[in-house]
Amino acid sequence: MFIILKFLISFFLICNFFNYNDHFASGQTLPPGFCPSPLIYRNSTNRQNDIENGYLFIGQTNCTSPCPSLIFSENEWHRVYNMSLIAGTISMFALIFLIITYSPLVNKYNGYTRHTVGILFLFCGIFLTVTTDGRQLWDIDLGFEKYCPEPGRFARQSDTKCLVTAIFFQYGCVTSILWWAAISVDLWMTIRKVKISKLQFITYAVILNIITLILTFAPIASKQYGYGEAAIGCWLMDLKYQVGYFWAPVGFCLCVGCVSIVLIIREIYKVSDAIKKKLLAKHLKPLMLIILMLSEFIYMFIFYSYTTSRRGHYHDVVEKYIRCLFINASNPSICEVDVSISSPAHFFFHFCMRLMGIEGLIFFGFTRQTKRIWLRSFWLNNSFIKKLIPSLSSISSDEKTSNSSHRTTRGCRETEFGESIEQSNDPEHFIELSGVDSKN
């Protein structure tokens, strides 16, 4: 009797086969409360409202997709979330150090130029990105509940935590890419010895931040922030909004960055060997960071473009998996999701974001300029610290004496990184890092 009943149920399900996300036929019915694992049954009284709240229904049934989605196995999801926790935490502390170093808390106002301000904005943007995406120290115990507040429900902007983290994540991403492009242009202007006034500097800084605010807050009106099927945090959901409010600006910034790098290399190549060595000595670290970040942005851009082009394939894979679930309703464990998106490639995509903070520490944290900023700061240059650590006082005094000697006896000029470069009577031999002219 049990075998006959099992056969009838399987026959009924096959005959009433449905499509996934509009790929299945509409108007199907299933036994009340029945959904093969890992699909989740949702007793919906207001289907449209449930969809807006983040439930992904399978065709016209009351079965919903699990959260996180079926695109990866649970182990693969845990792997990428654990990476976001470990790499993100390291990156977060590295960025905190860099932000404090270049902020008014430590760096004196007269040490600010368009380049140092650009670096500060860049690091702040990356910091917002790594602390609002994936898993962090302060929400380890939440597990998937942070982005899956209820079984089978993906978080939406109606969920306060999702909206707040999505806003900060989008703002951080846009800030990072815009100021990365600005820094790459600034490095070229530095080598070309181009100076701008304070008014011009403030103007383009304000414009960049206005663009960032528009690209961040405009999608809220269309309720576009939420947790997606391949994401590890809340962000823009619809493809057209992702392209219009992020990837199109990213593409433009990548073009600007590529052109700037080519022009920088061209300028370095044109000068004599002696000047070339000085240029490389002064600009090698910023240039390497710009090139590394360019390669990471390009990888993320290519990965996103590739996965977007295969959205149809992803739905076909999930459709095949769900067919298997309903055909083998009594033994769903034999069904497996075929690989639609490479798990290692997806892992590296999210790792790239966290790698930027670590790279920032390597190229801007362990430098003479960082040491000089801290030694000049109030925190290490006060009577209490000098009494507590006498050796630090002598080092600070040596720094001041050295700087004074450079300015008076060698006709040196300080750069925005607090490093001196000898002047020459030949204007072609004078290297000036980016500065802001005090004249308006």
Swiss-Prot record:
It comes from the Eukaryota. GO terms for molecular function: transmembrane signaling receptor activity. InterPro entries: GPCR_2-like_7TM, GPCR_Fz/Smo-like. GO terms for cellular component: membrane. Residues 395-428 are annotated as: Disordered. Keywords: Glycoprotein, Membrane, Receptor, Signal, Transmembrane, Transmembrane helix. Residues 107-110, 184-200, 266-285, 368-440 are cytoplasmic. Residues 28-85, 132-162, 222-244, 307-346 are extracellular. GO terms for biological process: cell surface receptor signaling pathway. It is found in: Membrane. Residues 1-27 form the signal peptide. It is a multi-pass membrane protein. Glycans are attached at residues 43, 62, 82, 328. PROSITE patterns: G_PROTEIN_RECEP_F2_4. Its main location: membrane. The chain crosses the membrane at residues 86-106, 111-131, 163-183, 201-221, 245-265, 286-306, 347-367. Belongs to the G-protein coupled receptor Fz/Smo family. This is Frizzled/smoothened-like sans CRD protein D. It comes from Dictyostelium discoideum (Social amoeba).
